[in-house]
UniProtKB/Swiss-Prot annotation:
Belongs to the ABC transporter superfamily. Spermidine/putrescine importer (TC 3.A.1.11.1) family. ATP binds at G43, P44, S45, G46, S47, G48, K49, T50. The keyword Nuclease does not apply. Its EC number is 7.6.2.11. It comes from the Bacteria. This is Spermidine/putrescine import ATP-binding protein PotA.
Length: 444
């Protein structure tokens, strides 16, 4: 497999819009993904997360905006020419082929670099000559398009344009943007075609056998090479799909809710397995799910998608502990929300009580949303911030989920201890358990 270093940004989405007819499904998506990261696109059904994945994979075209791969816009590059592999929810395996046959399928088109001594000098000279021609043509075409785009953008600044003319100009600008992307990729495309023809060779049968043996061992399918797909469990099918994607050595693996059809135990095992494989190979994984726990466990970073926009993009712990708003907090985990008032630096009022907080970035008197996670609340029988009584007790296997009524407020608490209904208790928390955020349209 490739030795891939985790460092620079490999994929960037810049001001990406996607429209289906009159419906805008993605709105100004900006997203940078580093090489070697496991990034999850998390959101409810219909939020646009799968559309983002399909745009990166080349299965959909952007309406406008850029999709940059290693700094070059590839939005007009077809799926089969992108250095990606996709694992679908239904696995998309070939039922008429065995495990080995499915994995071998992509390898048959693979090319191997020739050794330097196998390539005549005349071939290198020809390549350098053609490369100069391609570069000159690329520069000329890009310059022409820049002039055209500047002209169209100037025309669009006219506030007196009617809707019909504005749309016509915008369509021309969008079209020129796709042509710009095409010419940005012109040199790379021509160079790759030349290299494939003159600088590479077909993979041999012996090399195919070795690569298949190595990948089957990597994904834990040794001994199942000749089994039919219909004989496999869901977890094993997922491993075949993963092996088929990895064996072609893509830079990016796209995973569209690949674990959603598995039962809980197999799903948990596959989560661990996927993360282990990704870390071992150092590949970039872009993973779509609506399962919050799955995203938190697997990801280096999570992009939370809501109504076609990125609500928050950060490391899992940062999103869980410091959500940007109430919606994100509720979506990513269980929450207790209180209306709070910022008193002064490091002091906030919650349920009429002034408490210490680590927050110091707000304005005195500012109304805020206050988040406290259920697992951050402690129960004491003798003392605490607030006194209440247990009105609900649900056993969750590894903990108890309690609802505690404090005056007219219901507070959810997770605890390892059992408490009878109607038990009088006190609740409290550490200073850093208070997470403050601005209220939407809040007034000071």
């Amino acid at each position: 497999m490739k030795n891939i270093e985790k460092s620079e940004i490999i994929i960037s989405l810049v001001d990406v819009d996607k429209e289906f007819g009159d419906k805008k499904v993605l709105d100004q998506i900006n997203l940078d993904i580093k090489r070697g990261d496991f990034v999850t696109l998390l959101g409810p059904s219909g939020s646009g997360k799968t559309t983002i994945l399909r745009l990166i994979g080349g299965f959909e075209w952007t309406t406008r905006g850029e999709i940059k791969f290693n700094g070059i816009d590839i939005k007009d590059v077809p799926a089969h020419k992108r250095d990606t592999a996709t694992i679908f929810q239904d696995y998309a395996l070939f039922p008429h082929l065995s495990v080995r046959g499915n994995i071998e399928f992509g390898l048959k088109l693979k090319r191997i670099k020739k050794k330097a001594e196998e390539i005549p000098d005349v071939v290198w000279k020809k390549f350098e000559h053609l490369k100069k021609k391609w570069q000159d043509k690329q520069k000329r075409k890009i310059k022409e398009l820049k002039i055209l785009q500047a002209h169209l953008e100037k025309l669009l600044e006219n506030p007196q344009l009617d809707i019909k003319k504005r749309k016509k100009l915008q369509d021309k600008l969008d079209d020129s943007d796709f042509r710009y992307s095409n010419w940005e990729n012109y040199l790379t495309s021509k160079s790759e075609s030349f290299k494939k023809k003159y600088l590479t060779r077909k993979i041999t049968k012996q090399e195919i056998n070795k690569e298949i043996t190595d990948i089957i061992d990597l994904v834990g399918l040794t001994g199942n090479e000749n089994r039919a797909i219909s004989e496999l469990s869901g977890g094993m099918k997922q491993r075949v799909a993963l092996a088929r994607s990895l064996v072609i050595e893509p830079e990016i693996v796209l995973l569209d809710e690949p674990l959603s059809a598995l039962d809980t135990k197999i799903r948990q095992k596959m989560q661990v397995f996927l993360k282990k494989i990704q870390q071992k190979l150092g590949l970039t994984f872009i993973f779509v799910t609506h399962d919050q726990d799955e995203a938190l466990q697997l990801s280096d970073k999570i992009a939370i998608i809501r109504n076609g926009k990125i609500a928050q993009y950060d490391e899992p712990k940062q999103i869980y502990d410091y959500p940007v708003n109430k919606w994100v907090a509720n979506f990513i985990g269980d929450s207790n929300f209180f209306q709070a008032k910022y008193i002064k630096k490091n002091q906030v009022e919650i349920l009429g009580l002034k408490l210490y907080t680590i927050h110091d970035e707000f304005i005195p008197g500012q109304k805020l949303d206050c988040l406290i996670r259920p697992e951050d609340i402690d129960i004491d029988l003798d003392s605490g911030y607030f006194k209440g009584k247990v009105i609900q007790n649900i056993y969750k296997g590894s903990y108890y989920s309690l609802d505690i009524k404090v005056e007219n407020t219901i507070i959810n608490v997770e605890t390892n201890d059992f408490y009878d209904l109607e038990t009088q208790v006190f609740i409290k928390w550490d200073d850093d358990a208070i997470h403050l955020m601005e209220m939407e349209n809040a007034e000071i």
